[in-house]
Swiss-Prot record:
This is Aspartyl/glutamyl-tRNA(Asn/Gln) amidotransferase subunit C. PANTHER family: GLUTAMYL-TRNA(GLN) AMIDOTRANSFERASE SUBUNIT C, MITOCHONDRIAL. It comes from Chlorobium limicola (strain DSM 245 / NBRC 103803 / 6330). NCBIfam families: gatC. Keywords: ATP-binding, Ligase, Nucleotide-binding, Protein biosynthesis. Gene3D superfamilies: Glu-tRNAGln amidotransferase C subunit, N-terminal domain. The gene is gatC.
């Protein structure tokens, strides 16, 4: 399997990306290189090899919560450019 310049142009259009001719050539070459590598990986005999979901046997090893002294609210808000009551006030980001 190989990727053509038209394939890259199609994917770029779907992604709303624009590439120069030089970038288009580079992308085509790099994608073909990646596909070639994947084809090589597919040639490896993995019969009898157990699937690996992680490199460690332990999962979700977490430390215990430890309660400790925190900074005072007034001190935390001391250098805040804008605040409302006991909270930092920040500009609205989501419309």
């Amino acid at each position: 399997m190989s990727v053509t310049r038209d394939d890259v142009a199609y994917i770029a259009a779907l992604s709303r990306l624009q590439f120069s001719d030089e970038e288009m050539a580079t992308m085509t070459t790099e994608l073909n290189s990646i596909l070639h590598y994947v084809e090589k990986l597919n040639e490896i005999d993995t019969d009898g090899v157990e699937p690996l979901s992680g490199i460690h046997d332990q999962m979700n090893v977490l430390r215990d919560d430890v309660e400790k002294e925190s900074i005072a609210t007034a001190l935390a808000l001391q250098n805040a450019p804008d605040r409302q009551d006991r909270f930092f006030k920040v500009p609205k980001v989501i419309g």
